[in-house]
Amino acid sequence: MIQRVVRRATARRYGRIERYGANARAVQNEQLEYLLAAGRLTAFGRERSFGGIRSYDEFRRRVDVADYAGFAEYVERARRGERGVLWPGRVRWFAKSSGTTGRRSKYIPVTAEGVALNHMRGMRDVVTMATRIFPKADLFAGRMLTLGGSHSIEREGDAAEVGDLSAILIEHTPRMARLFRRPSRKVALTADFNRKVEALCRECATQNITALAGVPSWNLVMLTRLLEYTGRDNISQVWPNLQLFVHGGTDFRPYREVFRRMIPSQGMNYMETYNASEGFFAMADREGADDMLLMLDYGTFYEFLPTNCLADYEKAIPLAEVECGVEYAMIISNCNGLWRYMIGDTVEFTSVAPYRIRITGRTQSYINVFGEELVVDNAERAVEAACRATGAGVVEYTVAPVYMGGYHTQGAHQWLVEFRTMPDSVERWCEVLDEELRRCNSDYDAKRQGSATLLAPVVTILPRGTFMRQMATEGRLGGQNKVPRLRCDRELADALLNLK
């Protein structure tokens, strides 16, 4: 009943999304015009003469591509309460993010327009899309459980409020939506992640949960604890009406088999989204697809820089010029006051009519110490293949170089892996991992020829809970915190081995 009402109420919006393919250029031009009009009222815009910008070419000439370091000074001014720095008016909210590859915390501005036009529109569109992709799923017969971050809102004097993005969005969730959401606000905003999970189990174990949302790794922790708490064999016995997991934040491929075993219901569905502290960008629009539709009218103007020329920002191109099969670093300008901001994610287009993407990794997450140029997408594919071939299930993993021989001329990749389900054969798991890496990465394959430079992967199995213990020591439990998959150094690997 409610599902049918929602479908009718969102029909017009769904029609607009369907027309993305035909109207992409016009929609993106509208976003840029809107952003520039707002930017003219800011200190950032006045310094770059936004008032004189009449075209995209002029915009790119006057605004340099930058990462967080290039915006940090402006963000600090806004956090101190200065108005109109990056976006008109005062910015009250800041999403605290430690990122994936950096250790220093970032404070991403979250404006009122960013909440309304970006994050909340994205959440509504997930519902719009889910009711079309999974028409048989009765999602509104129960509650959606959202597992957010571990940072509650902290007030910084009278100027700013800082917290995990999920905590900020809870503060802005419409009253009607709260009726369908679990856990309670008190539990959701619990700062300690382990206490949050315990409270969530007590509160939600007997409720009618029909959908989950959040990061796969942290939901896996929660679901594992829920099984211990209830004494059940699988989640379908706890929540028999569970039909959808809306996931994002990390690649789902390494977790797919674990979730299928944990939730054996034939009616279970999975939907990927791409949202971060910086904004909401994409979501799946087809059942079973491994790509996502890029959302074009979220107050975001997109640009893309081929990853083979990351140091040459002049090679950045608008959406209209992208090609399928090329890996790009994504650059955004949006209504949170970010201007030509390189968010650190890399994507590949699978379609340009409409524009669909796959997340392939991070601009700073790779291993290239022997010329192998291993990227996250290669690693995720290989782990998925190895798990599928051996019946294994992975909780977390990370990869670091290990050197052998004199002068560091020969070495290997050390894979530190925490399994939920051990493979039938660890030796076979390693073989398939190596075979898949060689199949999908010609540079890796060349370095593996005859093991002259790169030896076979060295797999180190870590005890259950090792990654969580390490994340806890860093104060990074829950939310959008992620384990770096690939590192060119051994800092994380050695820290994990010391815990072991």
Regions found by a protein language model. Name each.
Residues 91-102, 459:
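ATP phosphate-binding P-loop of adenylate-forming
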Residues 104, 140-142, 241-242, 268:
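Short coil/turn connectors at secondary-structure junctions
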